């Protein structure tokens, strides 16, 4: 019996440490099957609803391809194409979708919405991103880290997340570290540290593990001897100009650049980025943003560092597919047989 059958994935703490690592192991196996053209379709006749209140590239494509690879069908419900929470309550929408579909993915603005969907739909619900958590991204990150260091335990791996950690990425990184024992440093000004209650809870969970979690403003302390530096965009499209200005002023000295890599004292340090990245000026939007705020060579990461690490970064992005596929298979099948 698969103990993840019919389980939701709203946040990583929905799983135990063993369950999380089993998902990573399954993702490795599914990735190998796909690479070897030996995909076994385990989800035939399954129907999946993809609710996107926020637009997406990687999350949507990963869910769709994962479902198609496994023989499932999907319905994409994009921004403005449902009555969710407007003409119809979230509860009522959840109840009807739960009768029509075997599982529901939600990507949107409010974590409370996905909690209501999960409570009322009676089918597995998966979080593609909310303002609180981004669990599917962290599953891909853990798979990427494991692929680079297959022989090392997570507690033997040091990762510094540099930039804005007061968001879904900071929260999910904390949860991931607390479950697998990753040695995690969140390197940011205090205004950009994660919520205190989440940090305190995850720190408490680490007591019986060999890893560690710290928050620090000190870049030298935070990145010294790390195996990975991880960053993300400092601001999102749609946030006000006031938010952009304040955030960029706070984080301008936390750019991931060649100097920061030297500070790690590790010539083999790897860089992760969950994308999209403001690293070059090849689009009008990014070009205007960089010019407005006085950046000549990328914002949160320089183009030089991005290009040198692009193989890992795009592998990390591809791993969204394989880990999401593992989540779908785990939650929609009573027994997993290859």
UniProtKB/Swiss-Prot annotation:
Top-level taxon of the source organism: Bacteria
Subcellular localization: Cytoplasm
BP GO annotations: arginine biosynthetic process via ornithine; citrulline biosynthetic process; L-arginine biosynthetic process
Residue positions binding L-ornithine: 168, 232, 236-237
Keyword vocabulary terms for this entry: Amino-acid biosynthesis, Arginine biosynthesis, Cytoplasm, Transferase
S-adenosyl-L-methionine recorded as keyword: no
Binding site for carbamoyl phosphate: 56-59, 107, 134-137, 274-275, 320
Catalytic activity: carbamoyl phosphate + L-ornithine = L-citrulline + phosphate + H(+)
Principal place of residence: cytoplasm
Enzyme class per UniProt: transferase
GO cellular component terms listed in the entry, alphabetical order: cytoplasm
Its EC number(s): 2.1.3.3
GO molecular function: amino acid binding; ornithine carbamoyltransferase activity
Involved pathway(s): Amino-acid biosynthesis; L-arginine biosynthesis; L-arginine from L-ornithine and carbamoyl phosphate: step 1/3
Cross-referenced PANTHER family: ORNITHINE CARBAMOYLTRANSFERASE SUBUNIT F-RELATED (PTHR45753:SF4), ORNITHINE CARBAMOYLTRANSFERASE, MITOCHONDRIAL (PTHR45753)
Recorded family membership: Belongs to the aspartate/ornithine carbamoyltransferase superfamily. OTCase family.
Protein name per its UniProtKB record: Ornithine carbamoyltransferase
Species of provenance: Buchnera aphidicola subsp. Acyrthosiphon pisum (strain APS) (Acyrthosiphon pisum symbiotic bacterium)
UniProt lineage: Bacteria, Pseudomonadati, Pseudomonadota, Gammaproteobacteria, Enterobacterales
Annotated gene: argI
């Amino acid at each position: 019996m698969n103990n993840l059958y019919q389980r939701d994935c709203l946040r990583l703490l929905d799983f135990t440490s063993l369950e999380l690592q089993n998902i990573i192991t399954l993702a490795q196996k599914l990735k190998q099957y796909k690479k070897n053209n030996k995909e076994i379709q385990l989800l035939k006749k399954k129907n999946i609803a993809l609710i996107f209140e926020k637009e997406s590239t990687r999350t949507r494509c990963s869910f769709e391809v994962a479902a198609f690879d496994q023989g499932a069908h999907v319905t994409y419900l994009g921004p403005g194409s449902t009555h969710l929470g407007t003409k119809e309550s979230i509860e009522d929408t959840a109840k009807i979708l739960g009768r029509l579909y075997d599982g529901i993915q939600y990507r949107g603005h409010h974590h409370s919405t996905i909690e209501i969907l999960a409570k009322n739909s009676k089918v597995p619900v998966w979080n593609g991103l909310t303002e609180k958590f981004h669990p599917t991204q962290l599953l891909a990150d853990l798979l990427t880290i494991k692929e680079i260091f297959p022989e090392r335990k997570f507690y033997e791996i040091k990762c510094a997340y540099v930039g804005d950690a007061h968001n879904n990425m900071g929260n999910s990184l904390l949860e991931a570290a607390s479950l697998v024992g990753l040695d995690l440093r969140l390197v940011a000004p205090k205004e950009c540290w994660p919520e205190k209650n989440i940090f305190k809870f995850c720190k408490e969970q680490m007591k019986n593990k060999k890893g560690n979690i710290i928050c620090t403003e000190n870049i030298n302390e935070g990145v010294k001897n790390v195996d990975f530096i991880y960053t993300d965009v400092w601001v999102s499209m749609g946030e006000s100009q006031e938010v952009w200005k304040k955030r960029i002023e706070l984080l301008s000295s936390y750019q991931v650049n060649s100097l920061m890599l030297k500070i790690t004292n590790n010539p083999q340090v790897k860089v992760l980025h969950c994308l999209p990245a403001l690293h070059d000026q090849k689009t009008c939007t990014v070009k205007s943003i960089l010019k407005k705020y006085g950046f000549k060579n990328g914002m949160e990461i320089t183009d030089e560092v991005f290009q040198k690490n692009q193989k890992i970064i795009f592998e990390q992005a591809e791993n969204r597919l394989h880990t999401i596929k593992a989540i779908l298979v785990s939650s929609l099948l009573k027994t997993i047989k290859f």
